[in-house]
């Protein structure tokens, strides 16, 4: 283990390496120039090697000295994991098989407006769950009571629904709670019937039946974001049941990183998925159609 990632001592250690040996460098973010994509820092790191291999897809959306800058000074290629990420996520962006079903969850629509619009242009159905579904349901005129609703995104949600035809699939029932706590009282109600003082924390059984029907016959399923507060056992059933539906679907299944990857692992079905991405923000930006700096810098993509 080197004491730093650049400098005379690191250079000396690099020169002593024998074939088959590995020198692990210190965290590049200990240098302020890393996140600033400082060309001098990138050049110093490049001086330690003959070839740069980027296998960190999860950092590919960041233009840092160790992801984008260094590639200006060395032959730069992708590693096997990076290659796999680009292959499977690339299918969803460039040449998806149909029927193509996309699933988006998570808390906020504001974080995923661009990916919603991009997916609607390519997929056959877009299933919306999680906290972001509350905003769509509120935009339809439903009283979501104490559920998380992004008031500032209501008009955006209305516009998306107006332009989506019959592609958008929203929850029809919900597991609700009287407080946002693991031990809260809970019950299942239709999304139109949430009582005052309660909030939606998971999708209900009728919604899961709807998901099952929509996923039937799919050739490609891309999932990013849980459909409930799966960190709390009482409100994890929807997310885990959805993971199992994907595992049994027979489709090519691509799981976005972050919470979705954690969910399929906790559900015990990660090995039954075609591809579980290691990139949270990176996979989302890739699905939005953005060019990732760490990928664009490579000689082979």
For each feature predicted by the language model, list its residue ranges.
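Active-site loop-to-helix "anion-binding N-cap" substructures in soluble metabolic enzymes
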Residues: 1-301
């Amino acid at each position: 283990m080197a004491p730093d990632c650049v400098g005379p001592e690191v250079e000396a250690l690099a020169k002593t390496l024998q074939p088959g040996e590995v020198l692990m460098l210190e965290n590049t973010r200990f240098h302020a120039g890393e996140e600033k994509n400082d060309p001098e820092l990138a050049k110093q790191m490049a001086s330690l090697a003959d070839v740069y291999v980027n296998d960190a897809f999860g950092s590919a959306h960041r233009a840092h000295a160790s992801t984008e800058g260094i590639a200006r000074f060395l032959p730069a290629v992708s590693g096997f994991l990076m290659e796999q990420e680009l292959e499977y996520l690339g299918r969803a962006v460039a040449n998806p098989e149909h029927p193509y079903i996309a699933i988006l969850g998570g808390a906020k629509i504001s974080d995923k407006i661009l990916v919603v619009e991009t997916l609607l242009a390519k997929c056959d159905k877009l299933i919306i769950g999680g906290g972001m579904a509350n905003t769509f349901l509120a935009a339809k005129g439903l009283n979501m009571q104490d559920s998380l609703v992004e008031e500032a995104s209501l008009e955006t949600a209305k516009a998306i629904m107006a332009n989506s035809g019959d592609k958008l699939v929203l929850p029809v029932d919900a597991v609700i709670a009287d407080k946002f706590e693991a031990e809260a009282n809970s019950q299942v109600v239709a999304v139109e019937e949430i009582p005052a003082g309660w909030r939606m924390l998971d999708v209900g059984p009728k919604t899961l039946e709807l998901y099952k029907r929509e996923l039937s016959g799919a050739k490609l399923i891309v999932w990013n974001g849980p459909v409930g507060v799966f960190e709390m056992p009482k409100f994890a059933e929807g997310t885990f049941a959805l993971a199992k539906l994907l595992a049994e679907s027979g489709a090519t299944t691509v799981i976005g990183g972050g919470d979705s990857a954690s969910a399929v692992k906790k559900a015990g079905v990660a090995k039954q998925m075609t591809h579980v991405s290691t990139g949270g923000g990176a996979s989302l930006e890739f699905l939005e159609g953005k060019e990732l700096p760490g990928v664009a810098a490579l000689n082979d993509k």
